[in-house]
Amino acid sequence: VAPAATLLPIKVFSGGTAASSAVTAGLDYAIASNARVINLSLGATSPTGDTGLRRVAATNNAVVVIAAGNDSTASPNWPSRYAKEAWANGTLISVGAVDVNKRLHTYSNKAGDIAPFYLVAPGVSIISSYGSSYAHMTGTSMAAPAVAGAAALVTGYWPYLRANQVSAILLTTADDLGAPGVDAIYGRGMLNVNRALAPIGSYTYRTITGAITRISLSTPGVVSYQPSVSSPSAFANVNTEVFDDYGRNYSSAEGAALAVRTALTVDGVLGRMDRLLDTSEQVLADGSTLLRLNSRAPDSKTQRATSPSQSLVSYQSAAGLSFSAGDGGLSSMTLGLMGSSWGHRLAGLDPILGNPLSNFAPEHRFASLGLPLVAGWQARAATLQSTRHRAASGDITLMEMGHVGARHAINVSTGDLSETGLLGGYSNSALGLNQATHSQGVTISGAYLVAPNWALAASYSQTRTAAPRASGMLTHATDIEANAYGVGVVRSDWLKTGDRLSLTVHTPLSARSGHLTYSVVQSVDETGSPQFGTQEVTLRPHAREWRTEARYTMPVRQWGGNLSAALSTRLHADNDEQAALQWVMGVRYQLTF
C-alpha cells in the first residue's frame, strides 16, 4: 500500500504470547524512533497496553492501527477497545476483516460500541510471511496492516498532518457498508485509499495578503475562459497550491483551465447568412417599413426545426423614427451602419461594422430607439441584456450618431459594458474573473459607394476596461486597453440580379496593454505553512488574430430558394501565435415554402 515507507519491526511476543509490559515497551520504542504509524496485530480479552497507548496518543504524532480480534464477538477486544476513550484523542483505529465480497468474516469481531473508530479491510486469504516461507492467512491481523499502509501513504504525502487528522481522513472516506451510516457491524465501512488521498470538503486558496477564498468541492464547476482579448497562453503559469478541509496541499493548475481555444464551424459561417435569408421586410401603406425575423436552430438529435431561438422586429416610420427589439443576440442587424438606410447595401460586412463590446453579450435580448435629426443625421440608443448565467455575461448600453449621404455613410458608436467576467473571461472566484467589471469603448465606422453596386467599408474600435479589484488570488491589476479594426467590400448584382459578393478582413478586439498580478502558494514547508510567490499575467498577446471572409449569396427564383457559399479563415486564432490556420468552406441551399 505504501511501498516507499520505512518499516521498523518491533518484537513484543515471546513464544505465542505478549505481556502487557512488552507491548508498552514496544510502543515506547516506537515513540522514541519517531514512528508515524504503529500497527498492532494483536489482542487480548482483558485490558492491556493502555500505559503505552496513552503516551502515544498524547504526542498526536503516530496513528495506531489495532486488529479488532477474531472471536466473533459483538465488539472488538483489547487494546482495540481503547479507541473510543477520550484520552485516545482519535489517534486509534480498530480494524475488522472482510472477504473479497466485502462481507465481514465469520471470526472477525464487529464494530459494536467502537463503531465511530472502526474500519474494515481485506483480511481473508491474504498472502503473508510464514516462518521462512509464505502462506495465505486470514484474520483481523491481516486486515490491520492494509489500514496501517493507507495511514502511511497519507502521512507520507502530508507529513505535517497530526495523527488524529490522518485517522479522521481514513474514517470519513470509508465506503459505507451494512446499514446506512455508522453501524454496529461495519462501523465506518470499508477502507478506500483513493478517496483518502483525494481532497475533502473544499479548496482553500491563500494569498500573501491574508485573503482566503474557499470553494466547496460539491459546488458545480463553471466553464472557464481566458479574456478573449488575450491568448490561451497568458495564464499558463498561474499555478498554486490549494488546501482541503484537513489542510492538505494539492497542486492546482488554475491557468490551464483558462486555456480555451475556439474553432470555426460551418454553422457559424453560414448561420449568419441564413438569418439574413429568414428576414422578411414589409412596406406599410404610410411608407413605413416593418422588418421581422424568426430563426430556428435544428435539434441536434432529430435535425428538425425547434421553436424560434432568435427573433427580431424592427419598425421604421416614413419620417425616420425607428424602434427595434429582439432576442437571441441579433442586435447587430439593427445597430450601427447595419441599422441605417445603407444596411441592405452593406449586408455581408456586419463582422467588421458592429461595436465589438456587443460580442461580450453573445446571447442577449435588446431594444433600440432611433431618432432622425437634421441633414441626414440620426441618433440611436440601445440596451443589450445578457441571458447567460454562471458564465461571462455583460449588459451593454450603446449611444450612436450616424449620417447617411448620397455616396457615404458614417457612424460613431459609444458603448458602456457592465460585465460579470473580464472581457469575455470567466472562472471560479479564485482567479477573480467572475467579478463585476466595467468597460467603455468607441467604434467609428464608415462606408463609401465606389460605384452604383460597389461599397467599401472600414471600422476602428478602441476600448478601455477599468482595473479589476483585488479578488481571490488576484492582488493587483491595471487598466486594460484594446482595439479592433477591419475593412470590407461588397458587390451586389455581380453575376445576376439580386446576388451579393462580400469580402472582409478584420482583427477582433485584442489587448494592447493590461496586467494582472496573482499571489500564489509555490510550496509548503515542513509544518504545512504556505510559501508565497507571485505570477504576473500580461494580457497583450504576442500575436493577434486575423479573420478573412468571402461570402456569396444568390436567389434561385425558379425554385423559390437561395444558394449561399462562404469561405472563412482565422490566422493566429484566439491571438495564439502557435495556432494552426483555421478555415471553413460551406455551401448551403435553402428552400422557402
Q: What positions do the PLM features span?
A:
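Residues on the lipid-exposed face of transmembrane beta-strands in outer-membrane beta-barrel proteins
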Residues: 311-315, 367-371, 399-403, 442-448, ...
